[in-house]
Structure formats: structure tokens, C-alpha cells
Amino acid sequence: MGRIVRVTGPLVVADGMKGAKMYEVVRVGEMGLIGEIIRLEGDRAVIQVYEETAGIKPGEPVIGTGSSLSVELGPGLLTSMYDGIQRPLEKLRELSGDFIARGLTAPALPRDKKWHFTPTVKVGDRVTGGDILGVVPETSIIEHKILVPPWVEGEIVEIAEEGDYTVEEVIAKVKKPDGTIEELKMYHRWPVRVKRPYKNKLPPEVPLITGQRTIDTFFSIAKGGTAAIPGPFGSGKTVTQHQLAKWSDAQVVVYIGCGERGNEMTDVLEEFPKLKDPKTGKPLMERTVLIANTSNMPVAAREASIYTGITIAEYFRDQGYDVALMADSTSRWAEALREISGRLEEMPGEEGYPAYLASKIAEFYERAGRVVTLGSEPRVGSVSVIGAVSPPGGDFSEPVVQNTLRVVKVFWALDADLARRRHFPAINWLRSYSLYLDAVQDWWHKNVDPEWRKMRDTAMALLQKEAELQEIVRIVGPDALPDREKAILIVTRMLREDYLQQDAFDEVDTYCPPKKQVTMMRVILNFYNRTMEAVDRGVPVDEIARLPVREKIGRMKFEPDVEKIRALIDETNAQFEELFKKYGV
């Protein structure tokens, strides 16, 4: 037990902390605020406090808890909403009303709720860390697998029968090799700064299907991959994150609102329970864990919220699920690091950020991956991390963006100009890239269409050609272009407006399945091939631009039936044949 000697914002310095450990959780002051030791010098400890420190004075006590910042992992995580240190916000509201009183704590998992447990092991079985003891139907979508904690191995000497239990009841007893008995409950605790172990990492070969055409077709992300969405204010970062949280084919979604506006978390809370999962027809909230750490909450908790979120994601990965983690926004976390670092009087790096910013960001993204989990029966699970970055003024040369780009493999650059033109998602196809294309193309070729990569590359080349032509058009006007190049501009406009643009608020267009994406691409590229043929045969470009099929191609994104979209290929061919007859070519 120590005494406070100095308070500067979220940082508290305490004396007399002999025996305290680095990253140990402490209770600060008379109110018992939650804090974490981030520096030790002799018996003096520097503590970052996860709550508002107003009113705390020197001389008040600091009490160590003996444990590091940990999360509870077990049934009850899904559909919950936590703050950055895994306090359940609903529970805190019951205790203190709409505003959180300081020093309040509540167990992260409900202690009184009974879960129906079905054992999958029997007495005498040998178990190791990561084995499944039994299953609990946590929601109608997700079956929660009760895992043996990674540090336990031995022989089952007692296992609970099928029935209803709370998370505090002992459901199994394991005799360890040294003869001691370990009692296992439905949940266990895990320190957030330590990554959960696994057997080995697998290459990311399966794409995370998001239903967003720009992302799936042009800049794919693999399951277990990492992506960054940088963009200036109002360019659609949060809406893109919401779209991915709603429609990506991950089985569990962890959404971290880290230092963003409170009304954005409210949007998620209001929308998700109403939205149905396209695969199961059940509310999306049933597969979601929300971590709300809005911009008016204490700065230090932002760092904790990032680690809390990724630890929960790794836990579901260990059960064999594909998890998508959205962090919105990692810039706010970096700003919190900068503020704490400044108060610690550390040497500032670029733009005032601490020198260790790069390693902190890398450490976070490195916890993503597709892995073979621990346990006697190997399972495959993945954590895909998608982090939004909000550089001030949309400047991509800023340290947070640059350090993020070093470690992520997919870059979706949001563009304020596209957003102003009402082109959403405002992902700039000339600046963005994905390094997973070669890895995921086999999956696309096997499961969707063997010509996927060829079509994608053709479309990309056309869009790049358009950017070159636009320069010329700006100088000399469109009439100076040869017919072939005028025709390219017609097709690329179709690609931009009828393919890349996607309406997040339209019932059909908000989610576009892979088969439909490929069929739409085929329709547009078929139009391109016929257009080039027509121009070479001498058909005027104006005639091609007036073809009635163009309007139908423009509307195909709102058509749920893939066969009707495919029929547009024959219709296009028929209209071109008529043109050829008309001009006798």
C-alpha cells in the first residue's frame, strides 16, 4: 500500500509501492479508482488511471490488487456492451444511473444468469489447454465452447452433468501431473497485454467476404488479415466500419469505439438489434461484442479498450470461430499514447508521438492471424483486424498512418473528393492496395469464377487509363480524344457509377454476394469488349452511348436475381448486332 505524492491529469505518482509489479492494477485514492502501474522507479510507481482523477489529493492511499489488467472470458460476452476495462455499461447504469459514478466496478460476466452446459468430455479423459470441456448455446447463432485455460493440463476427475449452471459454479476438476487438483469454472481470466497462445499460424488464403464490391473485388482482405481505413473527417470511415461489422462473413464481430463520438456507438446500438444476419436471419447483435470508449471518457482507457477488444477476439478465435475486429479509431489511441507520454516527460518522437508508437501499433496488428488453435483436436480460427485511422486534415504522411501502413497488408484510402461527389464507399481505387490478392485468388477461382483475377485486373487497368485520360480532357476537352478513348471513358464511368458506388442504405445494394459481383463485372466488361469492336468497325461513339441497355446496366445493382443480371449480356450483344446492321458493318 502506497500514498499519492503527485497528480497530473490521468497520471498519478505514488510512493511506498515496494513489491508492486509492472502493469499491476491498483485502486487509487479514497474513491478506489482503477489504475495500472506503467513505470516503477525504486518504491515510486507511476500509475495511469482509467477514470476521471478530479478531486484526488496527495496523501490518499493506493492499494495494489496483485493482478495485471485482465478480462473475464466466458459465456455472456456476446450482445454485451463494455467500457475500455470490461465493465458492463448496462450494469453500471443500474448501479449509478446514466452517468457512471467513479470507483464503480461490476463483474464483466453476469453472475446470476444460468447457462445450459452440455459436457463433451468424461471422467478419466486427458485434457490440455485449449480443449473443449462442453458447450453452452450462448445466443441462437453462436455456440459458446467452454475451453480448458491454456495453462492447465491433466486428467478429468470430475465433470458436471448436463444442466443449468452459473459462471461461478465449478464444472470440472482436473488432476494436474504434480497431483494438485485445478477447479475449472465456465470462465477464466486472461491478462490483456499478453497474446493468447496457439499451435501455429496458417497462411491467409480465404477471403473475408464483406459484400462491398470495391473491397471484395478490387482490394480483398483475407480472414486473419489486417487492413487500415485512413481518411479525413466525413469521408465515411465509420459507415464503412459499420458495413463491415454488419455484413462481413465473420462469425463473431468485436467493435471497439475508441475515442470516437458517442452518437456513433448509439447508432450501432440502435441499428444492430434491428438488422438481420443475412446467413441466419437472426439479429446481428447476437454475434457482436461492443466496447464503447467514447471521446469524453478518460484518455488512458483508450489504450486498455484496444487490448481488451483484441483479447476477447482471440478467445473466440480459440473456439474455432472467424472473428472480425473493428477499431474505430486507432488515431485516438495514438493520441492517448502521446498525451500519457507527454505527462511522463518522455522524449517526443515525430509530431510529439512517443518513439515507441511504431512498436505499439505493430504489437496490436500482429495479434491478428489465421491459426491452428491449442487443444488435442486442432481447430482453425482467425482474427481479422480492421483499424480506422483519422489523420488530421487527411494527411497520409502523418506518423500514425505511416506506421500503420508498415504493418497492415490492405490499405483502403478514403478520399474527401469522392465523398463530396457522393461516391460511397469513398475508397480511392488509385491509392488503395491489397497484398492478399495472390493469396485469395485460388479461393475465388475455385468457388466463384475461374476468370475473377483476369476480370479484376482488366477493370483496374481501365480505371487507371481513365485517370490518364481525365488529365487530357481537363486540358483540351473531351472532343479532342479519338473515338476509342471516348469509348473507354463511357465504360469507366459505368464501372465507377454502376459497380464501385454502393448504397449502404438500400435494402438490396447494401450487401452484394460474390456471385453477383462477378456477374456484374462480366456484364460491364462484355459491354466494353463489344464497344471496342463497334468503334473499330466505325460505329459512332454517340450511338453506343445512347444504347437502351446502358440504363439497365445502371440499375442492375438493385436487382437481387443474378440470372436477370446475367441476361443483360445477351441483351447487350443483341443491341450491338442491331447497331452493326444499321451501319452495315
Curated annotation (Swiss-Prot):
GO MF, any single term: ATP binding
Regions that span the bilayer: none
The keyword NAD is annotated on this UniProt entry: no
Gene3D superfamilies reported in the protein's UniProt record: 2.40.30.20, 2.40.50.100, Bovine Mitochondrial F1-atpase, Atp Synthase Beta Chain, Chain D, domain 3 (1.10.1140.10), P-loop containing nucleotide triphosphate hydrolases (3.40.50.300)
UniProt EC number: 7.1.2.2
Pfam families: ATP-synt_ab, ATP-synt_ab_N, ATP-synt_ab_Xtn, ATP-synt_VA_C
The entry's keywords: ATP synthesis, ATP-binding, Cell membrane, Hydrogen ion transport, Ion transport, Membrane, Nucleotide-binding, Translocase, Transport
A GO CC annotation given for this chain: plasma membrane
The UniProt record lists the keyword Membrane: yes
Enzyme class: translocase
Alphabetized InterPro entries for the sequence: AAA+_ATPase, ATP-synt_VA_C, ATP-synth_a_Xtn, ATP_synth_asu-like_sf, ATP_synth_asu_arc, ATPase_a/bsu_AS, ATPase_F1/V1/A1_a/bsu_N, ATPase_F1/V1/A1_a/bsu_N_sf
Subcellular location: Cell membrane
Lipid bilayer topology: Peripheral membrane protein
Binding sites annotated in the UniProt record for ATP: G231, P232, F233, G234, S235, G236, K237, T238
Any one biological process term the GO annotation gives: proton motive force-driven plasma membrane ATP synthesis
Catalytic activity: ATP + H2O + 4 H(+)(in) = ADP + phosphate + 5 H(+)(out)
Domain of life: Archaea
Signal peptide: none
General function of this protein: Component of the A-type ATP synthase that produces ATP from ADP in the presence of a proton gradient across the membrane. The A chain is the catalytic subunit.
Assembly and binders: Has multiple subunits with at least A(3), B(3), C, D, E, F, H, I and proteolipid K(x).
Entry's family note: Belongs to the ATPase alpha/beta chains family.
UniProt protein name: A-type ATP synthase subunit A
Species: Thermococcus gammatolerans (strain DSM 15229 / JCM 11827 / EJ3)
